[in-house]
Amino acid sequence: MSDIALHEEAVASTLAGRPHARASARRERPVQVVWCDDVRRGDVAQPNAPKLGVADTLAHAQSTAERNRIVTSLLHLTGFSTFAYFALEFTHERVESLYLHEAFTPSTYRGDYVRHNHHDVDPRTLGARVCNMPIVWDLQQLRRDHQPRDDDASDAPAALDGFLQTMQDDGMCSGIMYSMAVPGTRLHAFMSFTAPRRTREWITPATVEQALSIGLSVHKFASPQLIATSRERAVNGLTPFEQELLIGIAEGASDKEIGRRLDTSAHNVDYHLRKLRKRFGVANRIQLTYLTSKLELI
């Protein structure tokens, strides 16, 4: 535990205050909640993925309920009470969507994470994204490491307090979280383990290894469904005009050339491309072409 704790202390200064900064901006639109199921499994092949026994067991399970039972039985052997597998979709560091999987969402989930914008102040998700090791946490440590500054006049401190209180009320007082980027998407998948124990001292390196084994197995099974769902939503969200724009830049056409094809001005082409860059969270047309090709939108 000591080595893990030292790592947590080393990154605490990097994370301090940043959840407050994320929460300070008012939201123009609510975060969308996207549910994934088993229907899309296998749409996206992962030929280089490691062979994990638990992942194969999940793949051969006959139902969502059976998959949930498999993970729950493994969870109890490790000392944790809940496991959640979810993904956040980011655009310029702003959370746009929360992806949940039917088989790996705790039965206690009731929508507060989105309803109360907890995703904006949850220091665990930020920590998991910037750290190359699992985050081992307890509520006391989260509260201590993210105390608001004396000159902080925003509503972020109250939002963080509300999140931590909800965690405590739900018996989620300590745990482990880690994250993996989902290739070809703007998603980051998170594996979250929680327990009612008040401090993180009970979590040993062996416990972390067990959590990694379970979470990576779930990720191997479920990430293709995240990718397929993300692609489907991206395609469905494009108008025919936007698809033609993307085809044009993929072919190397200039704004003027694309405008001639679509019977519109180069200025209008530039305007819509800027909107697409903002939507997909990229800085230029090269990155836009790369991402839309990876997503198989064109």
Regions from the PLM with identified roles:
Residues 4-10, 34-42, 53-58, 72-183:
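Regulatory input/activation interfaces that engage signals or partners
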Residues 254-287:
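Recognition helix of helix-turn-helix DNA-binding domains
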Residues 195-208:
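Regulatory loop-to-helix N-cap segments in sensory/regulatory domains
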Residues 285-296:
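Short, basic, alpha-helical segments at the C-terminal edge of helix-turn-helix-like DNA-binding modules
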Residues 241-245, 255:
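The N-cap/first-turn positions of alpha helices
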Residues 210-226:
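Signal-transmission/dimerization alpha-helices at domain junctions
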Residues 224-241:
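Regulatory hinge/linker segments at domain boundaries
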